[in-house]
């Protein structure tokens, strides 16, 4: 709060089936708690694991959010399939701006720090060799566990240990590598608030 960082609301619940029955309530509660703590409303929101349910956009609008950044225009088996959605920002009915996370137009692969770590630099050098497939607005998804190994790492289920253990100390290096690629293609870097305001002014 004192540092005046660009932060926005995120769901507390990460079990998507549990979230499904309480998403609207949780969006409003997140806004209320955020506003009370920061003294201003949250402009943006992120749903758990990139999953949106019918009615969520209307609930976001009703809770006063200007943008959502939940959608991966990609597929994650068992959770979502948003390959039919654009890889560039769009406006939902109801006036909420969607700032989708980066996915490649030709393959719909999600370009996240977690996926950079899972697949490795050599794989992504091949995937990213054609900038024409990159979204013009490149929103990078990341988590704290991409950069810092949790103290309870060894207590995680085996599947999580295998996934998170791949290149677990390389999060910062791989993000820096991606940023340099983007710089080389002329991308400029802004926070989510600035991006939201700039894009909404164009609509």
Range-by-range predicted roles:
Residues 1, 23, 56-61, 202:
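Distinct, well-ordered alpha-helical segments
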Residues 1-10, 31, 61, 92, ...:
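Acidic (Asp/Glu)-rich catalytic clusters
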Residues 6, 66, 188:
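Residue-level detector of anion-binding/catalytic polar loops
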Residues 8-14, 143:
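Histidine-centered divalent metal-coordination motifs
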Residues 14-20:
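A short acidic, helix-capping loop that chelates divalent metal ions and anchors anionic groups
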Residues 23-34:
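An active-site-proximal "capping" alpha-helix that borders the catalytic cofactor pocket
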Residues 40-141:
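Active-site-adjacent pocket scaffolds in enzyme catalytic domains
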Residues 121-203:
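C-terminal domain-boundary segment and adjacent tail
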């Amino acid at each position: 709060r004192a540092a005046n960082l660009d932060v926005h609301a995120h769901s507390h619940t990460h079990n998507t089936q549990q979230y499904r029955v309480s998403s609207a309530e949780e969006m409003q509660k997140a806004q209320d708690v955020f506003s009370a703590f920061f003294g201003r409303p949250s402009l943006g929101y992120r749903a758990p694991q990139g999953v949106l349910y019918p009615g969520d956009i209307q609930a976001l609008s009703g809770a006063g959010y200007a943008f959502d950044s939940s959608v991966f225009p990609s597929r994650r088996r068992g959770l979502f399939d948003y390959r039919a959605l654009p890889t560039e920002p769009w406006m939902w009915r109801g006036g909420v701006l969607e700032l989708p996370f980066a996915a490649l137009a030709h393959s719909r692969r999600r370009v996240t720090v977690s996926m950079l770590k899972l697949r490795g630099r050599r794989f992504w050098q091949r995937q990213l060799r054609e900038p024409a497939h990159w979204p013009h607005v490149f929103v990078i998804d990341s988590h704290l566990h991409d950069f810092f190994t949790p103290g309870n790492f060894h207590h995680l289920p085996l599947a999580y240990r295998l996934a998170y253990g791949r290149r677990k100390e390389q999060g910062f290096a791989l993000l820096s590598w991606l940023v340099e690629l983007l710089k080389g293609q002329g991308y400029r870097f802004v926070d989510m608030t600035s991006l939201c305001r700039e894009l909404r002014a164009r609509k």
